[in-house]
């Protein structure tokens, strides 16, 4: 089945200009540039990240988009991707074709080249796992999770909460905003929101400080139903969360056009924060 499947995959790839994989070669050949590279990897596993209610197209789209969100969090420009599939023999070829279509259309949308991959089989049934590694280019300023200072504003893009009602399969990675924050050196620290504010925000807060949040300012999605707890624990918002010097906020607002940005708090000296009883956000294990 392997050779036949590889022939089918080669045919699917041929329909998309962003897929430049030489499927018979052992390695992808990439042009070298002098810029610094960003590399990220993420996985999508049936039964963990999606189930039968999710279309193959949406699953393929999400695999690419969640990796691109990592590139956005560092302010990078995506370049190349490779994919590794592990699946049981009962995964239908038609389903796999739609998965590839979701991946490839998303690659095309964000000018990402799929340059290689691997396929392996496992015993049993109903098993599917896809891991994608994306590389990109970083400019002079790279957004990192460390660097926030006392007095910095805490900001988010878009709206938060309620992702379980499909947003986590239809989100747009915030590449343009991440690139703007990096290019103009506007953010002191940045990350993408994948596990909810309760778990992700502490990663940006330096030791000896805490976050003072304005709960009324947190931008909630319609699917959150007005419940601010959703922004803290739902996870998979795939928005950007960053800190910045107060004097740079209006500069960013003037530059970001239609992109929605919101100040939700500040970094404050001392460790006696107000806290929440919202729990710890999404846990992977």
Regions found by a protein language model. Give the residues of each.
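Short, acidic (Asp/Glu-rich) active-site segment that either coordinates a divalent metal cofactor
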Residues: 38-41, 126-127, 141-180
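Short beta-strand segments at enzyme active-site cores
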Residues: 75-84, 115-117
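Glycine-/charge-enriched secondary-structure boundary and capping motifs
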Residues: 2-4, 8-11, 88-115, 121-128, ...
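A generic local secondary-structure boundary/capping motif
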Residues: 17-18, 27-28, 104, 118-123, ...
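Extreme N-terminal cap/leader segments of soluble proteins
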Residues: 1-55, 74, 83, 101-107, ...
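Small-aliphatic-rich amphipathic alpha-helix that forms the alpha element of a beta-alpha
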Residues: 57-80, 101-109, 176, 180, ...
């Amino acid at each position: 089945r392997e050779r036949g499947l590889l022939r089918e995959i080669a045919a699917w790839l041929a329909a998309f200009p962003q897929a430049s994989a030489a499927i018979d070669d052992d390695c992808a050949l990439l042009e070298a540039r002098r810029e610094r590279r960003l590399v990220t990897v993420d996985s999508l596993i049936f039964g963990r990240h999606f189930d039968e209610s999710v279309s193959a197209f949406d699953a393929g789209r999400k695999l690419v988009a969640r990796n691109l969100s990592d590139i956005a969090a560092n302010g990078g420009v995506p370049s190349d991707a490779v994919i590794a599939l592990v699946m049981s023999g009962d995964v239908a070829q038609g389903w796999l074709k739609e998965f590839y279509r979701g991946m490839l259309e998303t690659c095309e949308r964000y000018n990402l080249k799929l340059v290689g991959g691997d396929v392996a089989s496992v015993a049993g049934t109903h098993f599917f796992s896809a891991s994608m590694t994306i590389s990109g280019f970083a400019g002079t300023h790279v957004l990192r999770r460390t660097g926030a200072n006392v007095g910095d504003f805490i900001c988010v893009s878009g709206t938060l909460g309620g992702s379980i009602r499909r947003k986590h399969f239809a989100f747009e990675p915030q590449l343009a905003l991440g690139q703007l924050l990096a290019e103009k050196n506007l953010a002191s620290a940045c990350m993408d929101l994948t596990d909810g504010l309760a778990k992700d925000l502490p990663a940006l807060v330096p030791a000896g400080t805490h976050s003072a949040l304005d709960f009324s300012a947190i931008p909630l999605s319609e699917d959150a139903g007005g419940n601010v707890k959703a922004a803290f624990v739902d996870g998979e918002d795939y928005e950007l969360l960053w800190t910045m010097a107060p004097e740079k906020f209006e500069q960013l607002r003037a530059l970001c056009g239609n992109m929605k940005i919101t100040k939700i708090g500040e970094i404050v000296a001392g460790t006696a924060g107000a806290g929440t009883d919202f729990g710890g956000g999404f846990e992977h294990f």
